[in-house]
Amino acid sequence: MVCKGCGTNCQCSAQKCGDNCACNKDCQCVCKNGPKDQCCSNK
């Protein structure tokens, strides 16, 4: 599952996950632009 909230505009602070990571707690997904907390939302 990819980060749906911001599509390809997602990055993960955990290096092992890379960009457009799965929405995993270990990946700490955030949006590069816009509301960071919406990266892993289902909207």
From Swiss-Prot:
The protein's name in its UniProt record: Metallothionein-2
Cite the domain annotation text.
All cysteine residues are arranged in C-X-C groups. These are thought to be the metal-binding sites in other metallothioneins.
What is the similarity comment for this entry? Answer: Belongs to the metallothionein superfamily. Type 5 family.
Q: Which molecular function GO terms apply here?
A: copper ion binding; metal ion binding
Q: What does this protein do?
A: This protein binds cations of several transition elements. Thought to be involved in metal ion homeostasis.
Q: What induces it?
A: Strongly induced by cadmium, copper and mercury.
> What taxonomic classification does the UniProt entry list for its organism?
Eukaryota, Metazoa, Ecdysozoa, Arthropoda, Hexapoda
Q: A single GO BP annotation from the record?
A: response to metal ion
Record keywords, A-Z: Cadmium, Copper, Metal-binding, Zinc
User: Which residues are recorded as modified (Blocked amino end (Met))?
Assistant: M1
Native organism = Drosophila melanogaster
